Amino acid sequence: MKEATMYYIGVMSGTSLDGVDLALMDFSCAQPQLIHADFYPMPPAIRQQISTLCNSGTTTLQALGELDHQLGLLYTDCIQQFLQKHRLSPEQITAIGCHGQTVWHSPNSHYPFTMQIGDANLIAAKTGITTVADFRRKDMAFGGQGAPLVPAFHQALFRKPNQATVVLNVGGISNISRLLPNEEVIGYDTGPGNTLLDAWIEKHQGKAYDKNAEWAKSGKVNTDLLADLLDEPFFALPAPKSTGRELFNLAWLNKKLQKHTALLPQDVQATLVELTAQSIVDQLNQIETELDRHLLVCGGGVKNCLLMARLTALLPQWQVQTTNDYGLDADYVEAAAFAWLAYQRLNDLPGNLPSVTGAKSAVSLGAIYPKEKDVAA
């Protein structure tokens, strides 16, 4: 691989808690290029700690601090494996953009805040690579929701002058970026993506996810439960809006199920797929345009064939594709986005879109942790 100063590594672990995505991006050309990408499973013990924290909202300072340290070490280990696998030296990488792990996101509280953990000091010290992290709080300091941040990257890569493009990311939470010509970009969370599906099958079958949606396909959608789920006030909020596991979790689902105790677990799973699909479709149906409509899907939800089939069936006016068709692996769009955000930060360029987050202005995002190699690392 050539020597370069335009290689950036993006590191992302999302609300699905399945693992850590790494993407090596090259920004030396007008069109950013994904060079390598890999996935590293989340260790079960760390996954459980994060899940418990997100679902309960309570912990001790000791436990939170130790989890912050553990995640910093985990990200470091993933990066070092990635460098070794692809025969890269730290000197070839300009910077790492590490999102961290969101454990709480509360943009509408009296004192708005968001918390991502995974100590970037450890990453910079042990890799010897400048690291950019803490991307969301600067946007919130300027009055924004702190999310979603990826639409700015979507705009840079996917916006076209002659078509209505929407990028749909289905991770733990689903979010869309509306990229319409001659309009401000709008991007926001639509509701749950995989998080409820994964939590429900883990509870009943001990599996991390519903492979090929086989369990969901064995069930039937319960329209009464679906109506109760869609009655959640979040779905009626105007954009921009953001949400996370602090709302859509097993506690929320169990409360909704109190009126539906006779349902089979697989019927609940089928209904949760429909919830994800319907909450996405409800937002897309608000778009009025005479242009060709293209929906580009990315994230783990691309692998849910039932969800993809439902989106295609419910959106006959849209051409439903994946970002693979546009040259960017659907599994690694978010990781690539945080590499791009690190590039933007080091070049003092904006990383947010006020029309998306609600911030007062476009600003560069992220705190910089300069490379200072720990020789004992």
Swiss-Prot record:
Molecular function (Gene Ontology), one example: phosphotransferase activity, alcohol group as acceptor
List all membrane-crossing ranges.
Answer: none
InterPro entries with a match to the protein in the record: Anhydro_N_Ac-Mur_kinase (IPR005338), ATPase_NBD (IPR043129)
**Which EC number(s) does UniProt give?**
2.7.1.170
**GO biological processes:** 1,6-anhydro-N-acetyl-beta-muramic acid catabolic process; amino sugar metabolic process; peptidoglycan turnover
Query: Which pathway features in its UniProt record?
Result: Amino-sugar metabolism; 1,6-anhydro-N-acetylmuramate degradation; Cell wall biogenesis; peptidoglycan recycling
Q: Which positions does UniProt annotate for ATP binding?
A: 14-21
User: Could you tell me the keywords of this UniProt record?
Assistant: ATP-binding, Carbohydrate metabolism, Kinase, Nucleotide-binding, Transferase
Q: Which reaction does it catalyse?
A: 1,6-anhydro-N-acetyl-beta-muramate + ATP + H2O = N-acetyl-D-muramate 6-phosphate + ADP + H(+)
This protein's record includes keyword tRNA-binding = no
* Family as reported in the entry's similarity comment: Belongs to the anhydro-N-acetylmuramic acid kinase family.
Function of this protein? Catalyzes the specific phosphorylation of 1,6-anhydro-N-acetylmuramic acid (anhMurNAc) with the simultaneous cleavage of the 1,6-anhydro ring, generating MurNAc-6-P. Is required for the utilization of anhMurNAc either imported from the medium or derived from its own cell wall murein, and thus plays a role in cell wall recycling.
Q: Could you tell me what this protein is called?
A: Anhydro-N-acetylmuramic acid kinase
Gene behind this protein: anmK
